[in-house]
Amino acid sequence: MSNNALQTIINARLPGEEGLWQIHLQDGKISAIDAQSGVMPITENSLDAEQGLVIPPFVEPHIHLDTTQTAGQPNWNQSGTLFEGIERWAERKALLTHDDVKQRAWQTLKWQIANGIQHVRTHVDVSDATLTALKAMLEVKQEVAPWIDLQIVAFPQEGILSYPNGEALLEEALRLGADVVGAIPHFEFTREYGVESLHKTFALAQKYDRLIDVHCDEIDDEQSRFVETVAALAHHEGMGARVTASHTTAMHSYNGAYTSRLFRLLKMSGINFVANPLVNIHLQGRFDTYPKRRGITRVKEMLESGINVCFGHDDVFDPWYPLGTANMLQVLHMGLHVCQLMGYGQINDGLNLITHHSARTLNLQDYGIAAGNSANLIILPAENGFDALRRQVPVRYSVRGGKVIASTQPAQTTVYLEQPEAIDYKR
């Protein structure tokens, strides 16, 4: 396929719209979107969407690219717990080199590009006196920029106050260029340390004009309630749109009375949430007998309350999650199941949880299929969101700045009965 800039995308479907559409591109931007009267023939510098669905690129709002591709190195996480994952990572972290981090991150980034992801927020462990992973990922951010916008979270994996020089390392990471301040209050030694760590996180974000993304209450303990501190600080400082609480799996175990009071604060604060269905359903509930908790935050209730929430991977092939190919439709598929969002409308709108909601979480400004926006989009060989999710379709094309950066030829399956018949899994 030619790498020339496209002028038009034809025969496209758009979410919530009837018929076929053509999208005009100029200088890497969407210049106009017009309805078609019927199927149009392909012309030079046009791309045939083949009556597929055109949507903005997938967004990965939460991944750890510094740990990716390390599952089983040197040991596997046998218990499947978050805490053994941290132990296994500590073993692997001792073997880190600059080139090792870059090679593994690039391998997964290529998978993400192939899967239609063009915006990524990665957490990078800064509980390391040398900041090896951070320095490597800052280089990767510049190298991958033509294909992916990469945000880097300075993530204090072993705590801000509970790790030697944790606060100083976190601040140094921001000085070096990390985009987002991270925290992990539930992993600090005490509740008091956890609360204090959040105050320090907000102070650093204000000092360096950074976003905030907290690993928050990623535990089955119903007494882990640091999300209320995150929301209260965000509300007090007027920073809600710039603040994200990731995981909040303990919310799965909160009692109804407390949750009702909490949701009032969450709505007032305007903070964002990221759930990571594949990893949450794998790591949580490990200390339960039966019944076992699903351990995923209250996504359905957040959606009903108008609170911004999205889905991420968290991990791909590392000590916390031994599987994964960086496919966002797999994340969405699991998320809709475990959150019981299985009505037709909920499924059809589900793509928002890995596109528009995630873009809002990352504070992306130039995003969406609209005239004037950058010509960044993907084409799915599907009629609508429901069809895309049910059939788990590949990304037919990923377009960035008006150029195709990835394409996938759809597989064709044939069954040989009385007569050969192609199977497309459509009704």
From Swiss-Prot:
The keyword Lipoprotein does not apply. Fe(2+)-CDase is rapidly inactivated by H(2)O(2), whereas Mn(2+)-CDase, Co(2+)-CDase, and Zn(2+)-CDase are not inactivated by H(2)O(2). CDase is also inhibited by excess divalent cations. Phosphonocytosine, a mimic of the tetrahedral reaction intermediate, inhibits the deamination of cytosine with a Ki of 52 nM. The active site is at E218 (proton donor). Zn(2+) binds at H62, H64, H215, D314. Activity is lost under pH 5 but not affected up to pH 10. Fe(2+) binds at H62, H64, H215, D314. It comes from the Bacteria. Keywords: Cytosine metabolism, Hydrolase, Iron, Metal-binding, Zinc. It is an enzyme of class 3 (hydrolase). Its cofactor is Fe(2+); Mn(2+); Zn(2+). One of its GO terms (molecular function) is cytosine deaminase activity. Catalyzes the hydrolytic deamination of cytosine to uracil. Is involved in the pyrimidine salvage pathway, which allows the cell to utilize cytosine for pyrimidine nucleotide synthesis. Is also able to catalyze deamination of isoguanine, a mutagenic oxidation product of adenine in DNA, and of isocytosine. To a lesser extent, also catalyzes the conversion of 5-fluorocytosine (5FC) to 5-fluorouracil (5FU); this activity allows the formation of a cytotoxic chemotherapeutic agent from a non-cytotoxic precursor. This is Cytosine deaminase. It comes from Escherichia coli (strain K12). The gene is codA.
